[in-house]
Amino acid sequence: LMKIFIFIFCLLFSNFLNAEIISNEQDYIIDEDAKVRESTDELIVREITIDPETHPGNALYQDNCAICHDGSIQKAPAVNWLEMLIPQALFRTMNDGIMVDQSAHLSEEEKIQIVEYIVRKDRKDFPKEAELNYCESKRMKFDLREAPAPYGWGYNTSRFIPKNSGKIDSKNVKKLKLKWAFGFPYSQRARSQPLFAMGSIFVGSQSGDIYALDVETGCVKWNFSASAEVRTGIIMDEWKNGVKPKKRPYIYFGDILANEYALDAQTGELIWKIKTDDHPNATRTATSAKFEDILFIPVSGLEVIPAFNDDYECCTFRGGLLAVEADTGKVLWKKYSIPVPAKYSGTTSVGTRMFGPSGAPIWTSPNVDKKRRYIYIGTGENYSTPADDSSDAIIAYNIDTGEEVWRRQTLAGDAWNLACMGKALPNCPEENGPDMDYSASSILIDLGDKDILVAGQKSGSVYGINPDNGEIIWSKVVSGGGTQGGIHFGMASDGKVLYVPLNDMKNTHDGKVWLNRKPGMHTLDTETGNILWSK
């Protein structure tokens, strides 16, 4: 009888773990006095030095730009994206780029006024032209015997650097000294993960420029101007270290307007450029992954921003994953996190049309499973009602066909956009959050007798998942998480220990004060999920 009882208990407990879909009830309290989001201007890193309402660029924008960039033309970037660009990028687009024909009738003064209006700055406050420190001829060469450092950025996303490769430990880290520094022109932030290869460092920037820097001196070997900010990391074709590659190596990256690029790593010459998604609010944030001459490109979106406006018809964006030929940019397959397009679902309290389900953006770099030939991604919240099973989920696709193998949702009923921040404006979904994305890439770990896929969520929870079928092996609540808290970007593992950084914040400008905050570094046993230590 005791054996039967133990068997039933274990069976029930196992089913509980495998059905780990938690409700959207979170540990927070509502603070009526907390600062809440007043406008989307707060999201832009800038100082406003004009009055947008009275500036002459306002009328010029409405007459020449608004018809496309206020959301009516699918392929045109929404104005909230244009606001994030630096003035030089906008001038580049109008004078030499895709908007040359549309801008031909405008005078130089009118172009300046439009740019002033879009970036909310007077021309005297525009960033000044920068002089780059280009390398002397002897430092312009690339060492082709030095292959890209394989630190787990593009396969199992382990982010683990072995001691014999990194050569930095607790004993010598205090001896590090600054050798050189490179200031990014026209930039207020740096978010692109650099790549080290061929005696050089390749890195993107807020201005949209890609730089190849000499690793010894920091001088510039070449630079390339993309259409917009490059937030993704840089990856490169791989080859065996110590020998020259069989072909000229390319580097790959994406910009915030959802373009993906391939450049010749030695010259910076553009090899190909593709638009990864036609939605005006699509973007590229996560680094692509390359495997067997195929580039896997995740697509995210920020339609949550225009949804703040009462007259915006929210929402139609869907997260996506593309497989393309690395040499040519030819799309082999594309899958959406939400398999079917959003449908009309009614009107808001002010009469604006609504669509859904939407969202489930892919913030995470794809995780390539070479043994199973699967590729894993994590999704964010839905943007509009109804919430479906695509949000806050880990999804496995077949590498060769793109067919979905399994999906595991760990938080049901999560639909959220900026209209929910404090005031609950008309476009806020019925679910009203809590916005608990998977924004950190999963990690595939070999435990010897089995593999485990580990995923961390903004909810502050970590899951150990069976990569064969998506069943949850263990789960651990590390903290209370939050809209801008929990596991945001990047866990790491040496195979036995999982390193979990937490970004818990008290006030996230949404009127909620999150409880059970544990910001810092936490470590878990990869086999059991037990917490080892926390700092």
Regions found by a protein language model. Name each.
Residues 27-31, 76-124, 374:
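Extracytoplasmic electron-transfer domains, predominantly the class I c-type cytochrome c fold
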Residues 57, 61-72, 90, 114, ...:
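The canonical Cys-X-X-Cys-His
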Residues 87, 170-185, 210-230, 235-282, ...:
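Extracytoplasmic/lumenal domain signature
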Residues 33, 133-179, 337, 342:
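Blade/loop signatures of beta-propeller domains
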Residues 22-60, 131, 138-139:
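Electrostatic cytochrome c docking/interface patches
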Residues 17-19:
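Boundary at the C-terminal end of the N-terminal hydrophobic targeting segment
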Residues 75-76, 157-163, 187-192, 211, ...:
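Short, solvent-exposed loop/turn elements at domain surfaces
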